[in-house]
Curated annotation (Swiss-Prot):
Zn(2+) binds at residues 650, 652, 674, 735. Keywords: Amino-acid biosynthesis, Metal-binding, Methionine biosynthesis, Methyltransferase, Repeat, Transferase, Zinc. Pathway: Amino-acid biosynthesis; L-methionine biosynthesis via de novo pathway; L-methionine from L-homocysteine (MetE route): step 1/1. Binds 1 zinc ion per subunit. This is 5-methyltetrahydropteroyltriglutamate--homocysteine methyltransferase. L-methionine binds at residues 440-442, 493, 608. One of its GO terms (molecular function) is zinc ion binding. Its cofactor is Zn(2+). The gene is metE.
Length: 763
């Protein structure tokens, strides 16, 4: 019999219940007990949703981040929070969110002067994790309480529980040695803690534990590869059986290593590594199970079940009961339930599957394998009909878009003159001071903004009323910026629910869900648009709002656009053509908008590419191909303007030392980047690479409620000036201010502007 299991389930709830519970608690509007009760309710519901599986994951739920939870389980707390003796959950929030000392209050979630932990992307996804912190003296001590509590909850509900933990090698690989020490030297200290944790699982009656080692799909150097055998030799004596899980890519040169580790089962991503399955099946021990991830855990398209069965049936004949099937990775990256969607176009809806529907697909495959296709004949027929409907749909294919793609040539990506000539013209046109100040684009999404948008979408407010409400917010944002003394202003993006969804809603080839939310970090959720067909722009998308904002001020107003690479990487993308083709289609659409903004008199245009690095393949050997079409797409979008028009781009969480040459090839006049959480370490890239254009290193972390100190901003900019000539530096936050409150934004920007004025005095 084929065994079914899941690697992880979305934790936010079908209607973002976790998000709202967290934010209510952080505001002091609910108790810790109430927050924990919401968590327990979500876990119970999600286990019930997975009751049809042979094994359900336990420990995949986290109030903020699973890597942060693993740090606490291993007793690896940053030094700055070790003196806190309150509830562990509040301490985790201290690490995740930070807190400025003068922002402290008596609420239990208050964090008292604590810097937020560094946050970065989880492999090549749009999920963020809190980076574990190490140094030479790091010690580990087990705290299994969170996992044991969830196991007891699951057992009380009758769940066949499979605890999920991050493996020791991946955990060290994900972290950062603050003193530059060798992280691998910590492995001997870490392994006894893992062994003790496995013994706790045995004592709880656990049969299988899932240990995630996704680092095995990356290009590891010899030292990291060599760490696996002693690590798993040290854990092999435990009585609980271990399923080693890899996902997000192919094993390649690590395949033989993975197959030889002393574990009881191996999971591989059969979406990205299908060609390796036969080799893995031949190499794993005859006593080991092989779990194949046959349902795509990172996209929203229905699985072609007939094709999947045709591939699985021979494998099942070979492996028999040793075959397990699962999604390719945790369903954390998938929306929860397609059945919540009431407004989706019926045809397009028939092509989709969210997390719960993916589990339906999984159990249907198992039924067909265990009992024969005849028992699910009707379901297979319906699936085949949906697959063919999508393949042949005229809504997917647009001849005019394909013709425009065919006409692309190198000239579309070229500015008239090189940066030095452009910079001189832009300086004359904009007349900005030294260390010019700006923000990244968005300002707080207030309750009034959200209410107006909700009423407009519900038909309770007509467009005239909605437009008036948005113009009121834009006017406020402009006035606040003028009062603060910022140099290049933004309109604040009041009209935008999300930096990708906003554009997708206005592009042909996209469709939108109501409840297709996925977690980005903490309480931050995003609702990626669904790119289902060829992309085109029917009409201007932003010009009206930017022109209104520009009319409110004599200062330069930035046009704000999301770049083609980021729109692509933050969408659920069609899987019937190369991503590069979809990206070029997006580039042509954004190019049209850029030219319309310039025609309307906008002289500073920002094209955000926050997710450029996120799209990098996990293997460096595959980077060049991606970077070539990603940079080309940006240049197509940006480079049709006159020399006097200044093009900005923004990148967040982008450790870009290793792609700095490609970023320079984008040829944006100004790039703004996230550097505050890493204390300007990202600027190390400029020690060895002469970046030719202007740069704005983010001087404070907008993901934390901390208010930046003026002197600290000055110090950060002085560090930046050691690498970048002062005349090419901008002063800005590290990201948009959408998630902050005005009460936090105004003092933060006030200190930032004051710091810039201090810096000008020294020029």
């Amino acid at each position: 019999m084929v065994t079914t299991h899941n690697l992880g389930f979305p934790r936010i709830g079908a209607h973002r219940e976790l998000k709202f519970a967290l934010e209510k608690y952080w505001k002091g509007e609910s108790s810790r007990a109430e927050l924990k009760a919401v968590g327990a309710q979500l876990r119970a519901r999600h286990w019930q949703d997975q009751a049809r599986l042979d094994f359900s994951p336990v420990g995949d739920f986290a109030f903020y981040d699973q890597v942060l939870d693993m740090s606490f389980t291993l007793g690896n707390l940053p030094e700055r929070v070790r003196g806190f003796h309150g509830d562990a959950l509040d301490n985790a929030f201290r690490v995740a969110r930070g807190r400025s000392a003068h922002g402290a209050d008596d609420h239990s979630a208050c964090c008292g002067g604590v810097a937020a932990g560094e946050m970065t992307k989880w492999f090549d996804t749009n999920y963020h994790y809190i980076v574990p912190e190490f140094d030479t003296n790091t010690q580990f001590s087990l705290d299994p309480s969170r996992l044991l509590e969830q196991i007891k909850e699951a057992h009380a509900q009758g769940v066949k529980a499979k605890p999920v933990i991050i493996g020791p090698v991946t955990y060290l690989w994900l972290g950062k040695a603050k003193d530059g020490s060798d992280k691998l030297t910590l492995l001997p200290r870490l392994l006894p803690v893992y062994a003790a944790l496995l013994d706790y699982f045995t004592a709880q009656g656990i049969d299988w534990v899932q240990i995630d080692e996704p680092v095995l799909v990356t290009e590891l150097d010899a030292r990291w590869r060599d760490a696996f055998v002693p690590a798993y030799d040290a854990l092999a004596a435990r009585r609980v059986r271990v399923l080693l899980a890899t996902y997000f890519g192919q094993l390649k040169e690590n395949l033989e290593l993975a197959c030889q580790l002393p574990v009881d089962g191996l999971h591989i991503d059969a979406i990205h590594a299908r060609d390796e399955v036969a080799q893995v099946a031949a190499q794993v021990p005859e006593t080991a199970v092989l779990s194949v991830g046959v349902i795509n855990g990172r996209n929203v398209w229905k699985t072609d079940l007939n094709a999947a069965l045709a591939w699985l049936e021979p494998l099942h004949a070979t492996l028999g009961d040793r075959l397990w099937i699962a999604p390719s990775c945790s369903l954390l990256h998938s929306p929860v339930d397609l059945n919540s969607e009431r407004k989706l176009d019926a045809d397009i809806r028939s092509w989709l599957a969210f997390a719960l529907q993916k589990l339906d697909e999984l159990t249907l495959l198992a039924s067909a394998l265990n009992n024969g296709r005849a028992c699910v004949e009707a379901e297979l027929l319906a699936n085949a009909k949906a697959i063919e409907s999508r393949r042949a749909s005229p809504r997917v294919h647009n001849a005019a878009v394909k013709a425009a793609l065919a006409r692309i040539d190198a000239s579309l990506g070229q500015r008239a003159n090189a940066y030095p000539a452009r910079a001189a013209k832009q300086a004359a046109a904009l007349a900005l001071p030294a260390f010019p100040t700006t923000t990244i684009g968005s300002f707080p999404q207030t309750a009034d903004i959200r209410r107006a948008r909700s009423q407009f979408k519900a038909g309770e407010l007509d467009y005239a009323g909605y437009k008036l409400a948005m113009e009121r917010e834009i006017t406020r944002a402009v006035k606040e910026q003028e009062t603060l003394g910022l140099d290049v202003l933004v309109h604040g993006e009041a009209e935008r629910n999300d930096m990708v969804e906003y554009f997708g809603e206005q592009l042909d080839g996209y469709v939108f869900s109501q409840f297709g939310w996925v977690q980005s970090y903490g309480s931050r959720c995003v609702k990626p648009p669904i790119l289902f067909g060829d992309i085109s722009r029917p009409k201007a998308m932003t010009v009206e709002w930017i022109c209104y904002a520009q009319a409110q001020t004599a200062k330069p107003m930035k046009g704000m656009l999301t770049g083609p690479v980021t729109i692509l990487n933050w969408s659920f993308v069609r899987d019937d053509q190369p991503r590069s083709v979809s990206c070029r289609q997006l580039a042509l659409a954004i190019r049209e908008e850029v030219l319309d903004l310039e025609k309307a008199g906008v002289r500073v245009i920002q094209i955000d590419e926050a997710a450029l690095r996120e799209g990098l393949p996990l293997r460096r050997s595959q980077w060049n191909e991606y970077l070539q079409w990603a940079v080309e797409s940006f240049r197509i979008a940006a480079n049709g303007v006159q020399d006097e028009t200044q093009i900005h781009t923004h990148m967040c969480y982008s450790e870009f030392n290793d792609i700095i040459a490609s970023i320079a090839e984008m040829d944006a006049d100004v790039i703004t980047i996230e550097t505050s959480r890493s204390d300007m370490e990202l600027l190390d890239a400029f020690d060895d690479f002469h970046y030719p254009n202007q740069i704005g290193p983010g001087v404070y972390d907008i993901h934390s409620p901390n208010i930046p100190d003026q002197a600290h901003v000055v110090d950060l900019m002085k560090k930046a000036a050691e690498r970048i000539p002062a005349e090419r530096l901008w002063v800005n936050p590290d990201c948009g201010l959408k998630t902050r409150a005005w009460e936090e934004v105004i003092p933060a920007l006030k200190n930032m502007v004051a710091a810039a004025r201090t810096l000008r005095q020294a020029v």
